Swiss-Prot record:
Region (Disordered): 355-408
Xref: Pfam families: SID-1_RNA_chan (PF13965)
Record's protein name: SID1 transmembrane family member 1
Entry keywords, A to Z: Glycoprotein, Membrane, RNA-binding, Signal, Transmembrane, Transmembrane helix
GO BP terms in the entry: RNA transport
Record-stated family: Belongs to the SID1 family.
Highest taxon listed in the record's lineage: Eukaryota
Gene Ontology molecular-function annotations: cholesterol binding; double-stranded RNA binding; RNA transmembrane transporter activity
Keyword Cell wall biogenesis/degradation: no
GO CC annotation: lysosome; plasma membrane
Keyword Acyltransferase: no
Extracellular topology ranges: 20-309, 464-494, 563-572, 622-626, 705-710, 763-791
Length: 827
């Protein structure tokens, strides 16, 4: 028995040794197994509007669970606030929020990148969670939110957590809402279109320009891009200082609702602020970049306003057509009455009718327009019979030796003798063949058509590209609209700015019709060999008038193209034709009394091209570069002197290397050797005043260096044109010439229209000289028909003013149509 017991103990010894070994501790039969931890235990019991504090580290994380019930047709938005005193960017506090359809995460401190590798840290972060809306089909929904707070810090990082429900998350129509945002605490709100509203305007204002902010409109989808580095990823957006406005249409949002997102940028350079920010060590940015904002969503105009405004634009300018028809009908009745009374029909004995022909009310283009009959003070000149001159003037039987010496006709045909006479008359400067001169001036018309086609086609292509980029990217900082009065239509963002340019096209075409009528009447007079069309009045050349009409129409087309997307890159689209219009008007004024010595079309358009090129250089380099202004001012002064010399000497003063020697001789003989009055006093007065004006412009530009170089150049052209026109009218009255009622009315209308137009032009509703946000500070509401703004009225009035200006040039010398050309003075 004892042996059996020993044998049993010997068999159990290996098992006892194994159980007692250190690598395999013996299990206590009384110790229960360790319970598994429920990962949601720490999240249970979390409440809204309660601040939770804690410490997280490498081995500890806290999970909070929040639940609420969303009712149908009610949107409940939740906002999470997290604050951490830790500034250690290597071990930030990590926040992960899990919802039914979205996971949102961020770190505290929140890091933002700026220019030149600068970084900004924010220890207080709050984000709005993407809301889930219950529907009538689903009924009330139980929403569950988990907030996971963790950190990889070995020693722990403290934090504070607050989760709240937003009471004012949905914006209402015509109700202003005030709130505060910062770079680490962006805000966004929901807006739903009412059933009776198809378009709205989001208006955002702030009393403080900085910090720079971004307003974005995004479709209803999660996640919402509400941080500086991703706000541009979705929707429509624009930068903002004090004002922002975005026009939206219901048809662009399938759910008929959208989010309005407000983001504060960490730096202000995008809004025109400083590129450099003084940063101190251990400086917190939480309180330095807060901005108070006010948002209001108002209904935009209805479709009926589009129709009413379009009809207004058409009818207001069609009334000019009716007015011209009425004036033409009155002239026709007066002509018929005079014909019945027998006021026509007296004969001068040469077979030509001497009558107050209706051509006196038009602008004829004379055949051999420089010639007069044999009683002229310039004998010896002949007119070809084909040009309407009196027949029977054949060559004499003089011997061939007469060509060996100068006769009186040879002397009178010498330009240097004729154009340097003290008293010049129109017959002295209208000696060239009518057909040659007519073809010369028609080149202006054909050249400007060619320029317009080649200029407009790439312009249209470019602005279409700009508009496409705006529509695709949603970046409304590309174009400088007046966003408070920018009414979209189709793919166009500001249809009202385009529609208002219709006046240039319609009035330009009307001016072409008026010129064409005068041209036809004149040709009929030439065919009838009317002596008044041949030897009386100002020689008429319609080429420049046709060119002016085309230029006015193209100004409207290119201005409309510019306003498709006005910005720094396409300002010269319409200003180019403004320069050409001003230049053509000055050429026409000069050509009126100097028909034989006007500039050729090629040199004139080449000069305009140089001006446009200089303008582009001025816009690019003229802002801060003093050297550009020094060079430009010197060229401006020298060009004024050279042009003045050519005008004073009627083109007989050669500009070459010997100009300085000749100028010194003239100065010595006329000013030092004997001080004599100028030979051409009237011209001298005009040129002295003109040079003073141009030198003043040059000095002003050199001292102040205006940023808007394009407007500065346009001001030079307009001032010179007005100065020349005023001189022309004064000299006309001084020469005992009359101003008929029609041109007098046009002069008064021109002055009134230009004064009103310039008032609206200087309202400055936007400007591409600054940033888009700075430009929006100047935006204003519509003032006409709730559709047109101040700049649109400028378009209306400037088109009308240009039309009347052209009529002034067309009709100013109608009183001379019954005056012989050898009695019309040149000035």
């Amino acid at each position: 028995m004892r042996g059996c017991l020993r044998l049993a103990l010997l068999c159990a010894l290996p098992w006892l040794l194994l159980a007692a070994s250190p690598g395999h501790p013996a299990k206590s039969p009384r110790q229960p197994p360790a319970p598994r931890r429920d990962p949601f235990d720490a999240a249970r019991g979390a409440d809204f509007d309660h601040v939770y504090s804690g410490v997280v580290n490498l081995s500890t994380e806290n999970i909070y669970s929040f639940n609420y019930t969303s009712q149908p047709d009610q949107v409940t938005a939740v906002r999470v606030y997290v604050n951490s005193s830790s500034e250690n960017l290597n071990y930030p506090v990590l926040v992960v929020v899990r919802q039914q359809k979205e996971v949102l995460s961020w770190q505290v401190p929140l890091l933002f990148q700026g220019l030149y590798q600068r970084s900004y840290n924010y220890q207080e972060v709050s984000r709005t969670l993407c809301p889930s809306e219950a529907t009538n089909e689903t009924g009330p929904l139980q929403q569950l939110i988990f907030v996971d707070v963790a950190s990889m810090a070995p020693l722990g990082a403290q934090y504070k957590l607050l989760v709240t429900k937003l009471k004012h998350f949905q914006l209402r129509t015509n109700v202003a809402f005030h709130f505060t945002a910062s770079p680490s605490q962006p805000q966004y709100f929901l807006y739903k279109f009412p059933k009776d509203v198809d378009s709205v305007i989001i208006k955002v204002v702030s009393e403080m320009a900085y910090p720079c902010s971004v307003v974005s409109v995004q479709n209803i989808m999660c996640p919402v891009y509400d941080l500086d580095h991703n706000v541009e990823f979705n929707g429509v957006y624009q930068s903002m200082t004090k004002k922002a406005a975005i026009t939206l249409q219901k048809k662009d949002f399938p759910g008929e609702q959208f989010f309005v997102v407000f983001v504060i940028k960490p730096e202000d350079y995008a809004c025109g602020g400083s590129f450099f920010i003084q940063e101190k060590e251990n400086q917190t940015w939480n309180l330095q970049r807060k901005k108070n904002l006010e948002v209001t969503i108002v209904p935009s105009i209805k479709e009926s306003v589009y129709v009413k405004s379009s009809l207004f634009s058409v009818f207001i300018f069609l009334s000019f057509y009716l007015g011209c028809l009425l004036v033409g009908f009155v002239h026709y009745l007066r002509f018929q009455r005079k014909s019945i009374d027998g006021s026509f029909g007296s004969n001068d004995g040469s077979g030509n009718m001497v009558a107050s022909h209706p051509i006196a009310a038009s602008t004829p283009e004379g055949s051999n327009y420089g010639t007069i009959d044999e009683s002229s003070s310039s004998p010896g000149r002949q007119m070809s019979s084909s040009d309407g001159g009196p027949p029977g003037q054949s060559d004499t039987d003089s011997s061939v030796e007469e060509s060996d010496f100068d006769t009186m006709p040879d002397i009178e045909s010498d330009k240097n003798i004729i154009r340097t006479k003290m008293f010049l008359y129109l017959s002295d400067l209208s000696r060239k063949d009518r057909r040659i001169v007519s073809k010369k001036y028609k080149i202006y018309f054909w050249n400007i058509i060619t320029i317009a086609v080649f200029y407009a086609l790439p312009v249209i292509q470019l602005v279409i590209t700009y508009q496409t980029v705006v529509n695709v990217t949603g970046n409304q900082d590309i174009c400088y609209y007046n966003f408070l009065c920018a009414h979209p239509l189709g793919v166009l963002s500001a249809f009202n700015n385009i529609l208002s340019n219709l006046g240039h096209v319609l009035l330009g075409f009307l001016f072409l019709l008026i010129v064409l009528r005068r041209d036809i009447l004149h040709r009929r007079a030439l065919e009838a060999k009317d002596i008044f069309a041949v030897e009386y009045g100002i020689p008429k050349h319609f080429g420049l008038f046709y060119a002016m009409g085309i230029a006015l129409m193209m100004e409207g087309v290119l201005s409309a193209c510019y306003h498709v997307c006005p910005n720094y890159s396409n300002f010269q689209f319409d200003t180019s034709f403004m320069y050409m219009i001003a230049g053509l008007c000055m050429l026409k004024l000069y050509q009126t009394r100097h028909p034989d010595i006007n500039a050729s079309a090629y040199s004139a358009y080449a000069s305009f091209a140089v001006v446009i090129m200089v303008t582009v250089l001025g816009v690019v380099f003229g802002k801060n570069d003093v050297w550009f202004w020094v060079i430009f001012s010197a060229i401006h002064v020298l060009a004024s002197l050279a042009l003045s010399t050519q005008i004073y000497y009627m083109g007989r003063f050669k500009i070459d290397l010997g100009i300085f020697r000749r100028a010194a001789m003239v100065f010595y003989t006329d000013c030092i050797q004997q001080c004599s009055r100028p030979l051409y006093m009237d011209r001298m007065v005009l040129l002295v005043v003109g040079n003073l004006v141009n030198w003043s412009f040059a000095l002003f530009g050199l001292i102040y260096r205006p940023r808007d170089f394009a407007s500065y150049m346009l001001g030079i052209f307009i001032c010179n044109l007005l100065l020349y026109l005023a001189f022309y009218i004064i000299m006309k009255l001084r020469s005992s010439e009359k101003v008929l009622p029609v041109p007098l009315f046009c002069i008064v209308a021109t002055a009134v229209m230009w004064a009103a137009a310039l008032y609206f032009f200087f309202q400055n509703l936007s400007s591409w000289e600054g940033t888009p946000a700075e430009s929006r500070e100047k935006n204003r509401e519509c003032i006409l028909l709730d559709f047109f703004d101040d700049h649109d009225i400028w378009h209306f009035l400037s088109a009308t003013a240009l039309f009347f200006s052209f009529l002034v040039l067309l009709t100013l010398d109608d009183d001379l149509d019954v005056v012989r050309r050898d009695q019309i003075p040149v000035f």
